C-alpha cells in the first residue's frame, strides 16, 4: 500500500514539474514582438490616438 502511494506521488510530482517548465518556456518565448516600421503623415496631417493620419484644421 505504501509503495502505491509513493508511486502515485512521484507521478503527480513529475506532471507538476512538466507543467511548470512548459509554462516558464511559454512565458520566456512569448516576448517575440514584431515591430512594424512607422510611416510619417503627409504635410497638414497628424496621427490620432489610433495611429491614423487626420487632417489638421487651423482656426
Curated annotation (Swiss-Prot):
- The positions making up the signal sequence are 1-27
Propeptide, residue positions: 28-31
Tissue expression pattern = Expressed by the venom gland.
UniProt keyword Signal present: yes
One cellular-component annotation, GO: extracellular region
Q: Which residues carry this modification: Histidine amide?
A: 58
- Compartment(s) where it occurs, according to its Swiss-Prot or TrEMBL record: Secreted
Query: What are the disulfide bonds?
Result: none
Which keywords does this Swiss-Prot/TrEMBL entry list? Amidation, Secreted, Signal
Its primary localisation, in coarse terms, equals secreted
- Is Ribosomal protein set as a keyword in this record? no
Domain of life of the organism encoding this protein: Eukaryota
The molecule here is called U17-myrmicitoxin-Tb1f
The organism is Tetramorium bicarinatum
Amino acid at each position: 500500500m505504501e509503495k502505491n502511494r509513493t508511486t502515485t506521488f512521484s507521478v503527480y510530482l513529475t506532471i507538476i514539474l512538466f507543467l511548470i517548465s512548459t509554462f516558464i518556456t511559454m512565458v520566456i518565448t512569448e516576448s517575440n514582438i514584431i515591430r512594424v516600421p512607422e510611416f510619417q503623415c503627409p504635410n497638414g496631417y497628424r496621427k490620432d490616438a489610433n495611429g491614423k493620419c487626420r487632417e489638421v484644421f487651423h482656426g
